[in-house]
Amino acid sequence: MVNKIADRDADANIIVLPADHLIIKEKTFLEKVELAFDLASKHDYLITLGITPTRPDTGYGYIQFIEKKEEEFFKVKTFTEKPSLEIAKAFLESGDFLWNAGIFVWNVKSIHKAFQEFLPEMTHEFDTCEYNNDKESVCIETIYPKVEKISIDNGILEKAKNVYVIPADLGWSDLGTWTSVYENAEKDENNNAVKSKHVLTYNSKGNIIRLRNNNKAAIIDGLENYIVVDTEKALLICPISNDQLIKDYVLDLKNFKKGEKFM
């Protein structure tokens, strides 16, 4: 993608955004992006937006920064993949960690140079393609299965010395967890987030309830702060506080005899 854009504009700035995130404070977001574009235009920086954490969440990666007073952006010290709850609590208390939202801004020259330095073999492969013509897709389809499978964080950002972060309070949520879906969903008078046609609740509060099959009904009595998700192949019932354990549940289910058929 860098080569494709650079072929059209050798001085272009790029923003990389996940598709499944919710940003409520749009004005603040645009201001932070404008600052990032300005920095990327003037400096050889790789820039990321870091989200001000509101809780010790083990579902997100974390960015540690080196603070300098009266600055709107800071040099990145470390990236940490999804930590344990104990470590996440320590990160939150320290005050110098942000959530990694996967939002990046850079100039095509800066990111291409970083690819050349840290992922030279991959860069060489894609540099052989011709872009913005009929040959592009065939070339990429040939190369893509052969190159190293690695994230931009592991491949470049954890190694580069010119990575900067802009702290941002965006009203942000990664809709990849049930907790975040619940936080942003419409709720009834008992704070139940129900998105199914045929659900009756009694003495139940603070639950998120999802039924995939609209021809199925559910009656729930006495649950408080639970996740109830019924798919075509599996039923999940667990406390919302155990949201971060769902990946472990899925792994255990896969390890069942013929467990794959429930995925």
Where are these regions (language model features)?
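Short coil/turn connectors at secondary-structure junctions
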Residues: D9-A12, K42-L46, T58, F73-K75, ...
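A generic local secondary-structure boundary/capping motif
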Residues: A36-D38, G50-T52, Q64, A88-G95, ...
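Active-site donor-binding loop signature of nucleotide-sugar glycosyltransferases
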Residues: I51, F65, E81, V108, ...
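Glycine-rich, flexible loop/turn motifs
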Residues: I47, P56-G59, E72-V76, I87-A88, ...
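A short, charged helix-loop
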Residues: F65-L98, N132-N133
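Short glycine- and hydrophobic/aromatic-rich loop-to-beta-strand nucleating segment
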Residues: G102-W106
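Left-handed beta-helix
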Residues: V108-M263
